[in-house]
């Protein structure tokens, strides 16, 4: 559906941008793009590890994120178009989930490597940037009608009085 694709595009844009910002903060501290060299940062940078966890969970499209609402809308539209597309969409979802978990584990867990010393904590501007990415995601997750409009009422699991008055 058009609304589902729009929802997914907005959610993907915010989530991907957040993940790229986090990758850049890792690069600025480790000076390498290799994930194996950036492992173990959770013990050194706990706040950055929290940002990584929230970004990965959003990328996984876990409830109640806006990513889940967009993915479910697109999946329903694709499945109604052709029953074979559910296989492709399912594989895509599985690969995305596996890579997101792999990325989180490789960069945050484990013992940090020998070349990491004197790691600077995240700056205020970096934390502000992460909040500026997460705030719209949380806002859209708590109120999907901002994107979906009246289509949210049509596909909502819980029909509220607000939806009844609009129809």
UniProtKB/Swiss-Prot annotation:
InterPro entries: NADH_UbQ_OxRdtase, ND/Mrp_TM. Belongs to the complex I subunit 4 family. Core subunit of the mitochondrial membrane respiratory chain NADH dehydrogenase (Complex I) that is believed to belong to the minimal assembly required for catalysis. Complex I functions in the transfer of electrons from NADH to the respiratory chain. The immediate electron acceptor for the enzyme is believed to be ubiquinone. One of its GO terms (biological process) is ATP synthesis coupled electron transport. GO terms for cellular component: mitochondrial membrane. It holds the Pfam family Proton_antipo_M. This is NADH-ubiquinone oxidoreductase chain 4.
């Amino acid at each position: 559906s058009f609304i589902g694709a729009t929802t997914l595009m907005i959610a993907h844009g915010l989530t991907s941008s957040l993940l790229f910002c986090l990758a850049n903060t890792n690069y600025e501290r480790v000076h390498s793009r290799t994930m194996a060299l950036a492992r173990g940062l959770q013990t050194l940078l706990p706040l950055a590890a929290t940002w990584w966890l929230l970004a990965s969970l959003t990328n996984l499209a876990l409830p109640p994120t806006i990513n889940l609402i967009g993915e479910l809308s697109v999946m329903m539209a694709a499945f109604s178009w052709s029953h074979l597309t559910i296989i492709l969409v399912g594989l895509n979802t599985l690969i995305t989930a596996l890579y997101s978990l792999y990325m989180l584990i490789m960069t945050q867990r484990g013992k940090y490597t020998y070349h990491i010393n004197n790691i600077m904590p995240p700056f205020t501007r970096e934390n502000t940037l992460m909040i500026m990415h997460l705030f719209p995601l949380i806002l859209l997750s708590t109120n999907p009608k901002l994107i979906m409009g009246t289509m949210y009422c049509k596909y909502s699991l819980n029909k509220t009085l607000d939806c009844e008055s609009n129809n």
